[in-house]
Amino acid sequence: MVSPIGTKASEEQCYMGTYHSTRGRTLSCSSKVAIRTGIAPDGGLFVSDELGTQQLDISSLADKSYFEIAQDVLGMLLNDYTAEEISACVDEAYRGTFASKEVTPLVKLDAAPGADAPQTYVMELFGGPTSAFKDVALQMLPRLMARTSAKDGGAERIMIVTATSGDTGKAALAGFADAPGTGITVFYPEGKVSRVQNLQMSTQEGDNVAVCGIRGNFDDAQSAVKRIFADKELAERLEAAGTVLSSANSNNVGRLVPQVVYYFAAYAQLLRTGAIEAGDAVEFCVPTGNFGDILAGYYAKRMGLPVAKLVVASDKNNVLADFLTTGVYDRNRPFFTTISPSMDILISSNLERMLYFLSDGDCELVAGLMEQLAQTGRYEVPAELLAKIQSVFGCGWASEDEVRTAIKSCWDANGYVIDPHTACGYHVFEQVAPAEGAKARVLLSTASPYKFPRACCDALGLDVPEDDFEAMRMLEQATNTVAPTQLAELESKPVRFEDVCDVNEMASYVESAAKRMSTN
């Protein structure tokens, strides 16, 4: 569990249940405990060996709404929540909060990227309140946490501590703002997120929120957050004050499982339009840095979704593409700040869950690899494991120039604007041969182009204004599209948070925030 790590209280919350650590099976727990507490006592991530023992009926998907599919998927993965609890969470998270009744609608591209490619669709995951795919999970996670209680985690108040490369922070803040019994502290790399992303966080309203930039990159922030979770003395002080730490990153299984839903929802939409027949395989391409979004696709595959291939799309920080090609994971390399900042990551936390499942649950192997990563910054998987990984996952990456070219190519061919992260996936689909047997391709679009208006204007050959909001207006004019209201309004919102700290000051910042929020 995230906190109090290693204390007597934390171990008392773990009992024989569905979820256990990727690094050992000594303790197991319910999904409510896993969600409330975030990370296992040994630093591993919570997994369930029951994944895949229940399969969704693919033939019935076409007749189901997003809400019904979500209830089915979450009910299978979170089996200690009642059907009534799941139904309420789904309704609260998605009814009226997303722009489309489909929640994550598909858009058919006129021209499929790549040679000999089947019909290709973009799945728009950015219709939520912060215009990024993280909303799908982070509108759900607070509702799931609200259905837990102190007996599931050892304290009355939950303090969410999250590192963000840009999108998770705002989505988490929006989800947890003024949620009863919670507080949230978000750390982001100062100067390494877009201005729009920065303003989304720094203008956040709510009495239980705190936002702080750190001097460093996302990996520095994420590693420091993990150290905060492992700090026994801090955990004991917070617990004595009635607070337990938890995570809103995709390390938390409650962040991961809602993302499984939209893979099935995409398949349902393809069935309804007649693009495929039940049982046909679909290839998905996923821009990803922390491996959570694409891991959700693997969960869907284990649960019966006909997946031809899951293709990882990286930016210039291509540690994942290198790993999937060679079997060597090596973060000892230059870190690049790119125009796709949410993917500027060299330590992909959710890869640990994938290693667990594809090694057939070899906790000892996973623990050893994670220890090597912590000590040396690298590890290499056995050849037979790499072969299994490559049978499920494909990969590719895009340079900065290739990202810009992809944005322009997609616009020229389809009259459709994509953001720089989605453009990484578009480029990879152009370069990678279609998976054998794939009847359709789906590119996951992770953010609105209006979160990165200057990069999009530049790629489209427009004169790029220095100001992001001028760039939004220019992009609207040039493409005859409309910026999401919640982004356009940021220009006039007052900034509430301007804090910046060193990495070694983050724990103190969390403790101060927890004390301040406990008096609210």
Protein language model annotation of sequence segments:
Residues V2-N520:
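PLP-dependent amino-acid enzyme catalytic core
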